[in-house]
């Protein structure tokens, strides 16, 4: 995938060519991103494997008190800095922490720790940059951060034929990277709120202008196939 700027440049994803509107200075980083995406399979043998076990010191399977202690250690957060809520659809409990900065993303970030409906233990962590209320967010800074993270994840080997890079999944949303480990874990790196051009079968189409500022999101998932969320048993209705 390529991300570019004032003059949209060609963005070549793992499956579909895409173009982005964003500053020219992102071009070199994006070219590197594309090459990494295309060569990931060929280079995987010489790369260390990535095991999706959580985020920083927060490990999947930890209880809420354990994760709260880890948050305090990782970010110097106080109990009052952490909010707790229940997802009414999935039945999961979510601990949320806002941090003033988190490299490589620009500006503040939000880290959400999700606990399973049945197990009450950590099953997913989401890290997000970009505030929907901040219309002045710099798209180039968000794209640059996404490029750095894509290159980071692409530097590891993943389960065969599971990696994807530069895949449009919505009018203004692109999966910069996704990969699955040898067990049940998965990572998703998503860029939202960007305008791009996509080339398919020799024809180009342009996405609509984004309705909000750019956002960058990482999902660390413990069980990609069978998440611990509230479900209605088969045959109940």
Report residues per predicted region:
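Sec-dependent N-terminal signal peptides
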Residues: 23-32
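Mid-chain, structured segments of secreted extracytoplasmic proteins
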Residues: 85-136
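N-terminal secretory signal peptides that target proteins for export/translocation
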Residues: 1-23
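Non-cytosolic coordination micro-motifs
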Residues: 45-83, 89-90, 124-237
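C-terminal segment of classical bacterial N-terminal signal peptides
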Residues: 33-42
């Amino acid at each position: 995938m390529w991300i570019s700027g004032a003059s949209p440049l060609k963005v070549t994803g793992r499956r579909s060519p895409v173009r982005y509107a964003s500053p020219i200075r992102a071009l070199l980083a994006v070219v590197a991103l594309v090459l990494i995406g295309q060569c990931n399979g060929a280079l995987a043998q010489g790369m260390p494997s990535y095991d999706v076990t959580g985020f920083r010191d927060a490990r999947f399977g930890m209880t809420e008190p354990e994760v709260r202690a880890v948050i305090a250690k990782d970010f110097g957060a106080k109990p009052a800095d952490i909010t707790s809520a229940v997802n009414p659809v999935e039945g999961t409990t979510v601990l949320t922490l806002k941090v003033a900065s988190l490299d490589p993303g620009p500006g503040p970030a939000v880290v959400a720790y999700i606990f399973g409906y049945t197990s009450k233990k950590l099953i997913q962590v989401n890290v997000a940059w970009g505030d929907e209320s901040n219309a002045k967010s710099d798209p180039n800074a968000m794209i640059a951060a996404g490029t750095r993270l894509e290159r980071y994840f692409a530097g590891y080997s993943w389960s065969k034929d599971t990696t994807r890079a530069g895949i449009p999944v919505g009018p203004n949303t692109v999966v910069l990277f996704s990969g699955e480990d040898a067990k049940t874990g998965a990572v998703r790196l998503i860029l939202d709120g960007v305008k791009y051009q996509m080339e398919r079968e020799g024809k180009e189409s342009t996405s609509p202008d984004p309705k909000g500022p750019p956002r960058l999101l990482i999902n660390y998932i413990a069980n990609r196939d069978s998440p611990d969320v509230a479900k209605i048993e088969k045959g109940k209705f």
